[in-house]
Structures are given as structure tokens and as C-alpha cells.
């Protein structure tokens, strides 16, 4: 089948974790780097092998400079469901596209990658020898080759039922690897300043990619905590800032979250985290502030808002306020005063967040946030809605047998008007989502039932 325009076929080798997050990440990144998402497969599902149509090798390389969901990308020369189909496909690949990488002055090596099966060395050599019909003119160099070619075999997803023959076989020229090493180099275990709910490094980079963060963007986190999401954005050259209602967290005070450490040190703060990774120049500031009462002037400031609001499980949901009938006026409080706080219903928190994003994001800017859900009752109608924001993706991460959190990505498609502020009250999504006010109770009721069941089994 002829490809549209000047598109070339590439094979993506995907990582087998966070499966739902992979497609939105690739789509978002392609739109950032000037590509357009078109595919030659109807669905990707859980397979680690994706075939993409991409305009140029430069775009393929730029994609791999950002993605943490993909391991490698290859220029696809041929594929089939059997060795014979693969060889037929390779023989039909234009020779003029092969020659630049196979001439006599070049060096190369051929690698074998199998998914869900291990081959013996003898089997690997047999597969490589079968490619002798390709016009390789260069010399083999296993240590520092100019060009690397790969045979990739897919034996399905079931480790308990591995077929004798692969479902699909691919052959291509290696182009580049993804950024999987960032997950280790930015690991929370190695981070100077952490909290109880510091975001996993891999998920932080996925959120940043879903938000289409790019160099010189302004990124904001209204529930900043220890700033893990800011670090991922700063890595890609964005300027970062945030707010949090917790004075101790913002200033790096109070009890430490690390084992065998009682109190936080004098230099444990968000700025020190960015300094640790050489990213301090991208740090603007972090403020003690209440997300339910934004203190920003009217206007569109942010290219992206990326956040992980508290769910009331490991961190409390709070807003400033008082139970008294006549709370003390803020104008009477000294500058150093930290207001008392009230509980902050989850539904109110998320609708406040959407309103804030609609008011302060630039047109085309993205809001990326986590939404906790009680799985037995979840429906798509529960995802908060706003007339200025369009839902881009909704990806699930399971937390337990009965709870999950969903990574919601929204894009601003319309300028904010005052009448939009309370439009959610008229939405069909409002009443279903109010049930999330009891997410904490449902979470702990599930935990209690599980513990009781385990205790009952242990006594039988």
C-alpha cells in the first residue's frame, strides 16, 4: 500500500508499562515536533511493536529525544507473519533506499530482538545468515558499527503460551533510542527533597509530554508539593513555578519522609531539587497559596498546568477558611499569618482547577492532572467538564482492586468568559462527579474489607 505524500514507515519498540499512556504521549509529541499522527495499523493495543508513518528521519529522531514510553525506533525495511513473508517484503523495498547504508566503505552489525521468547545463539545466527540476499557490501563491526540493523520477532503477550513461530517479524535500520534512562537518573530515590506523595519520575515525564511542554514554556503546578512535576518540565527547558497550601512543604520544614531521618535539613526544598539536576535557572518561584482562591491577576500566563491534586489519602485536601460564623478578615492579619484551613471537597477542587486553567492557560495550552476514581462506580461521565477545555486523553492507572486514578489531559480551545465560571453546574457531568466527595471513605472501606477478609482466612 502506498503511503500518503512523502511519509516513511518506522517501527516503534514500546516499553511494556503504563500501556494506556503510550498512544497519547506519541500523538502529543508528534504534534509538538511538526509531525502528524498517522498509522498503518488500526489499533496498537498492548503490542510493543507499532508501525508509524512519519515524514522524515529528523522527526523520528526528535520524537525519541522526548519519549519515555518508547525504547527505540527503526526505519522499517520489511515485515511479515513468517520468514518467507519478511523476505518477500524486504525484496520489494527500494534498493536505492538501502544502498547508502550498505556500501563497501560502511560498517554494520545485525541484532536480534525477541519479545516473549529467548533464542539460542545458534537460532540467532541462522536468522542472520538467512538475510544473505540483502546487498550488504560493508564490513561487520560488532563494537562500533556505523549502522545497526535489527530483526525483531513478536511471540505474543502470553508468557504461559509461547508459540513456536512468531506472530510477526520485522527488519529495520536502527535510528535512535528513547529517553528511558531518565526514569533512573531522575529517580525519587536519589532526589534531595521528597515527600509522602512525590511523583514517580517516569510518570512525571509522561505528564510533561502529554502537556506538550517545550523550551521556554511557562509551566505551573497549583498543588506543587515537593516539585517533582516541575523538575520534569524544567528538564525540557520550560520555566516552572507553583503554589501549595502547606507552608512546611513549600519551605522545606517539618518531619522528613525518608526512613531513618526525623526532620528535614535546612537545604531540603524545591529549589535545591532543581539545583541537583542543573536546572535551577528554570526555577521562578513557589508560593504558599490556596488553590481555591487564586491570587493571580486576570490574564493568560501559562502554556501548561500540570498537577497531582491531593486525594485525602496520604495528603489531606484543604483550603483556607474557618468554621466560625464571622472569620477574621484577612486585612487584619500580619503578613506572616498562615490562615486556618477547612476540608476541600474533591468535586469542588477539580471544578476550581478547570476554571483556573480556563482563565489562565494560553489558547492551545494544556491542563494535565490526576483524577482519583472508585472503580466499581466509575463512568466516563464523571470526568469534570468545562466549555473552554476539550478532553484529549483519559488514561487509567490502577491503585488497588477497587480504586484507580486517571490521567486527564485537556486543551484550551476557547477564551474564557465570565459566564463559563459556573457552567459546570448545568452540565450532565456535575451530579455524577459529586460522588467523588466520598472517594476517601470508599477507599478506606475497601481496605478495611480486605484486611477483615485476610484475617478471616488466616484464622481458618
Swiss-Prot record:
One GO CC term, this protein: tRNA (m2G10) methyltransferase complex
Provide the GO MF annotations for this entry: tRNA (guanine(10)-N2)-methyltransferase activity; tRNA binding
PROSITE patterns reported in the protein's UniProt record = N6_MTASE, SAM_MT_TRM11
- Where does it localize? Cytoplasm
Q: Which GO terms describe its biological process?
A: methylation; tRNA processing
N-acetylalanine (modified residue): where?
Answer: 2
Which InterPro entries does the protein's record reference? DNA_methylase_N6_adenine_CS, RlmKL-like_Mtase, SAM-dependent_MTases_sf, tRNA_mtfrase_TRM11
Question: What EC number(s) would the UniProt record show?
Answer: 2.1.1.214
Domain of life per record = Eukaryota
| Keywords recorded for this protein, A-Z | Acetylation, Cytoplasm, Methyltransferase, RNA-binding, S-adenosyl-L-methionine, Transferase, tRNA processing, tRNA-binding
Reactions catalysed according to its record: guanosine(10) in tRNA + S-adenosyl-L-methionine = N(2)-methylguanosine(10) in tRNA + S-adenosyl-L-homocysteine + H(+)
Summarize the subunit comment.
Part of the heterodimeric TRMT11-TRM112 methyltransferase complex; this complex forms an active tRNA methyltransferase, where TRMT112 acts as an activator of the catalytic subunit TRMT11.
Entry's family note: Belongs to the class I-like SAM-binding methyltransferase superfamily. TRM11 methyltransferase family.
Q: What does this protein do?
A: Catalytic subunit of the TRMT11-TRM112 methyltransferase complex, that specifically mediates the S-adenosyl-L-methionine-dependent N(2)-methylation of guanosine nucleotide at position 10 (m2G10) in tRNAs. This is one of the major tRNA (guanine-N(2))-methyltransferases.
User: Under what name is this protein listed?
Assistant: tRNA (guanine(10)-N(2))-methyltransferase TRMT11
Q: What is this protein's gene name?
A: Trmt11
Amino acid at each position: 500500500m502506498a503511503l500518503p505524500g512523502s511519509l516513511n514507515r518506522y517501527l516503534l519498540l514500546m516499553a511494556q508499562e503504563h500501556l494506556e499512556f503510550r498512544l497519547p504521549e506519541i500523538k502529543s509529541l508528534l504534534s509538538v515536533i511538526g509531525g502528524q499522527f498517522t498509522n498503518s495499523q488500526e489499533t496498537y493495543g498492548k503490542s510493543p511493536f507499532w508501525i508509524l508513518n512519519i515524514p522524515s528521519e529528523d522527526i523520528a529522531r526528535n520524537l525519541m529525544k522526548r519519549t519515555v514510553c518508547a525504547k527505540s525506533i527503526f526505519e522499517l525495511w520489511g515485515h511479515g507473519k513468517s520468514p518467507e513473508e519478511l523476505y518477500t517484503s524486504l525484496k520489494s523495498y527500494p534498493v536505492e533506499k538501502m544502498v547508502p547504508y550498505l556500501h563497501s566503505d560502511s560498517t554494520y552489525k545485525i541484532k536480534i530482538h525477541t519479545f516473549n521468547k529467548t533464542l539460542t545463539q545458534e537460532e540467532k545466527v541462522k536468522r542472520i545468515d538467512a538475510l544473505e540476499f540483502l546487498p550488504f557490501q560493508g564490513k561487520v563491526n560488532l563494537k562500533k558499527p556505523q549502522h545497526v540493523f535489527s530483526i525483531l520477532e513478536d511471540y505474543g503477550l502470553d508468557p504461559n503460551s509461547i508459540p513456536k513461530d512468531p506472530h510477526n517479524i520485522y527488519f529495520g535500520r536502527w535510528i535512535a533510542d528513547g529517553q528511558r534512562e531518565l526514569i533512573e537518573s531522575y529517580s525519587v530515590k536519589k532526589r534531595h527533597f521528597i515527600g509522602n506523595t512525590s511523583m514517580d519520575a517516569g510518570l512525571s515525564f509522561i505528564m510533561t509530554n502529554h502537556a506538550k511542554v517545550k523550551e521556554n514554556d511557562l509551566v505551573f503546578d497549583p498543588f506543587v508539593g515537593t516539585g517533582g512535576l516541575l523538575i520534569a518540565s524544567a528538564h525540557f527547558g520550560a520555566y516552572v513555578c507553583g503554589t501549595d497550601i502547606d507552608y512546611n512543604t513549600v519551605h522545606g520544614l517539618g518531619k522528613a519522609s525518608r526512613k531513618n531521618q526525623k526532620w528535614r535539613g535546612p537545604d531540603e526544598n524545591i529549589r535545591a531539587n532543581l539545583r541537583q539536576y542543573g536546572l535551577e535557572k528554570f526555577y521562578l518561584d513557589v508560593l504558599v497559596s490556596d488553590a481555591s482562591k487564586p491570587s493571580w491577576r486576570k490574564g493568560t500566563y501559562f502554556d501548561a498546568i500540570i498537577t497531582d491534586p491531593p486525594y485525602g489519602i496520604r495528603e489531606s485536601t484543604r483550603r483556607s477558611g474557618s468554621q466560625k460564623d464571622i472569620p477574621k478578615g484577612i486585612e487584619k492579619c500580619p503578613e506572616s499569618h498562615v490562615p486556618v484551613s477547612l476540608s476541600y471537597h474533591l468535586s469542588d477542587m477539580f471544578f476550581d482547577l478547570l476554571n483556573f486553567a480556563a482563565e489562565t492557560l494560553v489558547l492551545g495550552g494544556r491542563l494535565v492532572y490526576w483524577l482519583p476514581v472508585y472503580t466499581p462506580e466509575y463512568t466516563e461521565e464523571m470526568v469534570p467538564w468545562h466549555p473552554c477545555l476539550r478532553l484529549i486523553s483519559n488514561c487509567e492507572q490502577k491503585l488497588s482492586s477497587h480504586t484507580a486514578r486517571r490521567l486527564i489531559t485537556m486543551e484550551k480551545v476557547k477564551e474564557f468568559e465570565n459566564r463559563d465560571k459556573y457552567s459546570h453546574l448545568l452540565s450532565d457531568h456535575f451530579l455524577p462527579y459529586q460522588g467523588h466527595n466520598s472517594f476517601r471513605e470508599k477507599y478506606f472501606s475497601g481496605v478495611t474489607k480486605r484486611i477483615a477478609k485476610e484475617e478471616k482466612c488466616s484464622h481458618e
